[in-house]
Amino acid sequence: MSRLNIFLLIIVMGCALSVVNSTNQQRQIFIQLQRAQSQEHQLQQDYAQLQYQQSALSKTSRIEQLATSSLKMQPITTGRTQYLTLSPGAAKAVDVPLPASAAPTGGAR
């Protein structure tokens, strides 16, 4: 065999190994893609389930039931309501200086 034939054989073998390597990488990336898509689908299902649970837990009837049973709260009645009346000078507005870190920095006036 001539040197040219040996050189070409080495080039062909290198190309064949390169094709095998790229095919293997493509398969691994495709497997990762399928796993990511499966995880995305599972997360979407979990999110929908959590939204349903949130809506069920935030219903007014459930909140009232928990307030009366767990916290021993009772509905407001006029007989138990106490009204406070203030004398005309009892409520007085007082200016309190703000610390420098809480002072407004030029918003709307």
From Swiss-Prot:
Cytoplasmic side: 1-3
Coiled coil: none
Pfam families with a match to the protein in the record: FtsL
Record topological domains on the Periplasmic side: 22-109
Family matches, as InterPro entries: Cell_div_FtsL (IPR011922)
GO biological process, alphabetically ordered: FtsZ-dependent cytokinesis
Location relative to the cell: Cell inner membrane
Main subcellular location: membrane
GO cellular component: cell division site; plasma membrane
Transmembrane segments: 4-21
Keyword set, alphabetical order: Cell cycle, Cell division, Cell inner membrane, Cell membrane, Membrane, Transmembrane, Transmembrane helix
Membrane topology designation: Single-pass type II membrane protein
NCBIfam families: ftsL_broad
Protein family (similarity comment): Belongs to the FtsL family.
Stated role: Essential cell division protein. May link together the upstream cell division proteins, which are predominantly cytoplasmic, with the downstream cell division proteins, which are predominantly periplasmic.
Record's subunit section: Part of a complex composed of FtsB, FtsL and FtsQ.
UniProt name for this protein: Cell division protein FtsL
Source organism of the structure: Burkholderia pseudomallei (strain K96243)
